[in-house]
């Protein structure tokens, strides 16, 4: 079945977990050990193909309900801002933590645009889950599963999951169940395409590290292809036309980084094409609508100086080499980045749970899903129910982070009150409900310029500023917000080397 050499020690608690994880001599035990214990130096895993085809594979794996004497289990779906902040704050003396996510790291999204052009390296914005919550890799009852959740059975207190694989030389997609005492849905949202034809096939989003990698490779490929002998002037201009759809902070920051890259690096290292490369930002309404008019006008002025062209219009169709606006204008492009906001994911839409007016999972002031026991939702996938009388909070990192922190403290209080087990917290006083206070907004626009607005809203009184000082505040603030000292060091070193030597334009 399996063989592990040089395994240091398996504690009695670990042995009990393994015994319960194993059903009928299945290969799930070997799968668990291979993914769970970093001290295993050699592992041989039984192929799932040996299981008879007429047998339901889901019976071969799963985490059963916790027993008396074991810690209650908190299952977290997602590894974004909300889920990771919750896992960081949860008391692992009270709970076992199981995280289910299609990625094993958290992405520091405010700096993701900088990785697209080589200002920062990709590892600078990715923090492993095992560093955020060490119990995931150390405690016998805590796990991380690289998987997607496909179904919620709230009556049975179970989630149904399916492993994420490459479909080639690893395991075939493997279905399993996890019983929970407390479930936290923090699965985030997906990019909104508004049903526009061709967006999914031709545009690149900017929400994950692999998106930034794809943008960087595509950008550098187009730069090199445009210098090919014999290429027409028209085709060269198309290849070097970078189009950004969406004038929110992500779209504006990426446009600023891209224009900065063109002015400082492309013109020095790709002198033959420096006059043909340009950036166009398309927005249906005003850019940076969350900022006041003064800050928006400053951003437009600075981006225009950097060569960014603004087009007001609605995209109606996206083809492989051009997009078409509502007035019939055709815009050829070589790189298309789509940044038009987010909406509920297919998983969230599939759940038979109450929804808020925007289609997100409906919650009350304590992050609970009122219609089911022991289920909470935080981050971009959740919003207040209309019955609470509260408006839906914006899909921002600072909202998700503070919801995660609040819920971690709430679950810790519930656990200390002996309410950690399933269906045991009905009579526990939950305390003060969650209250969100906006701390302000920031956006960089390139060329050592940024916008900083420290007011609760764009119409309130307070501090707002622009220019170099704002850029310095923006960098300082985000450097301190990077989760680990390791990544802070990476970010600081990357900024320094970029300033001294320029951006890395290697296409690897």
Curated annotation (Swiss-Prot):
GO terms for cellular component: mitochondrial inner membrane; mitochondrial matrix; mitochondrion; peroxisome. It is found in: Mitochondrion inner membrane; Peroxisome. It is an enzyme of class 1 (oxidoreductase). Its cofactor is FAD. Keywords: FAD, Flavoprotein, Membrane, Mitochondrion, Mitochondrion inner membrane, NAD, NADP, Oxidoreductase, Peroxisome, Transit peptide, Ubiquinone. Expressed in seedlings, roots, cotyledons, leaves, stems, buds and flowers. A motif (Microbody targeting signal) lies at residues 499-508. NAD(+) binds at residues 240-276. Residues 1-46 form a transit peptide. SUPFAM superfamilies: FAD/NAD(P)-binding domain. Induction: Accumulates in response to ammonium but repressed by nitrate. Binds 1 FAD per subunit. Residues 48-68 are annotated as: Disordered. Alternative NADH-ubiquinone oxidoreductase which catalyzes the oxidation of mitochondrial NADH does not translocate protons across the inner mitochondrial membrane. Belongs to the NADH dehydrogenase family. This is Internal alternative NAD(P)H-ubiquinone oxidoreductase A2, mitochondrial.
């Amino acid at each position: 079945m399996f063989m592990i050499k040089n395994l240091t020690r398996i504690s009695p608690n670990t042995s009990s977990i393994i015994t319960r994880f194993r059903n009928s001599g299945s290969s799930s035990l070997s799968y668990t050990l291979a993914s769970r214990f970093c001290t295993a130096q050699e592992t041989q895993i039984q192929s799932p193909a040996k299981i008879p085809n007429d047998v339901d594979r889901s019976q071969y794996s799963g985490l059963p309900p916790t027993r008396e004497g074991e810690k209650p289990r908190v299952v977290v779906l997602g590894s974004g801002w909300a889920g990771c902040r919750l896992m960081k704050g949860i008391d692992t003396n009270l709970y076992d933590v199981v995280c289910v996510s299609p990625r094993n790291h958290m992405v520091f999204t405010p700096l993701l645009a900088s990785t697209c052009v080589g200002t920062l390296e990709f590892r600078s914005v990715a923090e492993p889950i095992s560093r955020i919550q060490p119990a995931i890799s150390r405690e016998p009852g805590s796990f991380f599963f690289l998987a997607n959740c496909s179904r919620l059975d709230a009556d049975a207190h179970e989630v149904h999951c399916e492993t994420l694989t490459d479909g080639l030389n690893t395991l075939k997609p493997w279905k399993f169940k996890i019983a929970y005492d407390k479930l936290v849905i923090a699965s985030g949202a997906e990019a909104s395409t508004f049903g526009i034809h061709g967006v999914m096939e031709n545009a690149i989003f900017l929400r994950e590290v692999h998106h930034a990698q794809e943008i960087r490779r595509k950008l550098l490929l187009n730069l090199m292809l445009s210098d090919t002998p014999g290429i027409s002037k028209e085709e060269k201009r198309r290849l070097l036309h970078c189009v950004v759809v969406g004038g929110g902070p992500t779209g504006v920051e990426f446009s600023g980084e891209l224009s900065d890259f063109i002015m400082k690096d492309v013109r020095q290292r790709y002198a033959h094409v420096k006059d043909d490369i340009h950036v166009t930002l398309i927005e249906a309404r005003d850019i940076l609508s969350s900022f006041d008019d003064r800050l928006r006008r400053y951003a437009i002025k600075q981006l225009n100086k950097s060569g960014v062209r603004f087009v007001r219009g609605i995209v109606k169709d996206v083809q492989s080499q051009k997009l078409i606006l509502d007035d019939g204008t055709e815009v050829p492009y070589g790189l298309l980045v789509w940044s038009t906001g987010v909406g509920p994911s297919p998983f969230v839409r599939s759940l038979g749970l109450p929804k808020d007016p925007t289609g997100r999972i409906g919650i009350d002031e304590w992050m609970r899903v009122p219609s089911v026991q022991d289920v909470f939702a935080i981050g971009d996938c959740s919003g207040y129910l209309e019955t609470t009388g509260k408006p839906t909070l914006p899909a921002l990192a600072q909202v998700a982070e503070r919801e995660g922190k609040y819920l971690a403290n709430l679950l810790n209080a519930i656990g200390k009150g002996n309410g950690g087990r399933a269906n045991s917290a009905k009579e526990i006083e939950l305390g003060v409900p969650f209250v969100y206070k906006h701390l302000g907004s920031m956006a960089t626009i390139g060329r050592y310029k940024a916008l900083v607005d420290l007011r609760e809203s764009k119409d309130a009184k307070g501090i707002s500023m622009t220019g170099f000082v704002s850029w310095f505040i923006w960098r300082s603030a985000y450097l301190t917000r990077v989760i680990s000292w390791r990544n802070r060091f990476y970010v600081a070193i990357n900024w320094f080397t970029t300033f001294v030597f320029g951006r890395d334009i290697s296409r690897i």
